[in-house]
A protein has these predicted regions:
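A glycine/proline-hinged amphipathic helix-loop "lid/cap" segment
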Residues: 1-78, 305-311
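Alpha/beta-hydrolase superfamily serine-hydrolase fold, recognizing
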Residues: 28, 65-71, 76-311
Length: 311
């Protein structure tokens, strides 16, 4: 178990960091959480995801997994591994898509040799919890049932990291590894984000009230399916975590690592200085993220050889 600290050094990632910072500095059109602001956010997030180039030699196909839409990415030559990656995109539960994240999914498929399924869960606020969570859960159950000899790795960023951790807790018997990029794990406003991000409006205002209307609905924010902060970390599959040093969700990422350490779960964490939230999903587009991609793919493969799922 270890926490590895790295710095942004390449012009490629430096430029992307500056671009993200400039975008975040712009005022939001409409009251945040309004229909207009959500549409603007969806456009902006989709544009960012689509800016990541698709990996060569990877094909895509639309599939259905127990009624849940997904996009399968696999190499033209066919997968070289029986194992499966399930990628769940981020976007604050209200934006992003499997279609927009083909660049990152294709990098996962090419580097790992695994079939990579990107889940096209239904966004909020069109639906509220637990619709999207259950869609992801049903997809995992379908893949596990149809592929009994395959290890399944969950990869998620931000809101997708929330889903991935909560799903791994729910299906410890079916998940062999979890890779989390800047996960958000607490909507009960219990975790101390101000400790690491004292100037962040998100840390100051909390997430509970905002997401109560947009995602949580009338459910308890301390439900582990909503806030895996409150979940059961015992016997969790091995976890690899990435985040930026100065982002507001650093506290969330660190908490997951420390809980893994407490329960003796195999875990690694990479903290980047000078990047941005969920920077790892840039994939092969920068030297730092390409190296990181190789690191967590190697972690996954090592885990899949040594980690035995309890039957």
């Amino acid at each position: 178990m270890s926490i590895i600290k790295r710095e942004v050094t390449s012009p490629e990632l430096t430029r992307k960091s500056a671009k993200i910072a400039a975008m975040l500095s712009k005022p939001v059109k409409g009251k945040f959480g309004s229909k207009l602001s959500i549409l603007v956010l969806r456009y902006a997030i989709g544009k960012l995801y689509r800016s990541i180039p698709k990996a060569d030699g990877v094909k895509f196909s639309k599939v259905m997994l127990a009624g849940t839409k997904a996009i399968l990415a696999e190499t033209m030559a066919g997968s070289t591994s029986l194992d499966i990656i399930v990628y769940i995109h981020g976007g604050a539960f209200i934006s992003g898509s499997a279609a927009a994240t083909k660049g990152y999914a294709s990098a996962l498929a090419r580097r790992s040799g695994c079939r990579t399924y990107s889940i096209e869960y239904t966004l909020s606020p069109e639906v509220l919890f637990p619709v999207a969570f259950d869609e992801c859960l049903n997809a995992i159950d379908a893949l596990a049932g149809d592929n009994p000899d395959s290890n399944i790795t969950l990869i998620g960023d931000s809101a997708g990291g929330n889903f991935s951790l909560a799903l791994a807790m729910k299906r410890k018997d079916k998940i062999s590894c979890v890779i989390l990029h800047s996960p958000v794990i607490d909507f009960s406003d219990t975790i101390d984000r101000l400790k690491y991000a004292p100037d962040s409006p998100v840390a100051k205002n909390g997430l509970k009230n905002f997401f109560a209307k947009l995602y949580i609905g009338g459910h308890d924010a301390a439900d582990p399916r909503i806030s895996p902060f409150w979940g059961d970390y015992e016997d969790l599959p091995p976890v690899f975590i990435t985040c930026d040093k100065d982002e507001v969700l650093y506290a969330d990422a660190l908490y997951v690592y420390e809980k893994c350490e407490e329960y003796g779960i195999k875990a690694e964490m990479v903290v980047m200085d000078g990047a941005f939230h969920a920077f790892a999903t840039v994939g092969e587009a920068t030297p730092e993220t390409a190296k990181l991609l190789d690191d967590y793919i190697a972690f996954m493969k090592d885990v899949n050889i040594s980690h035995k799922i309890k039957q």
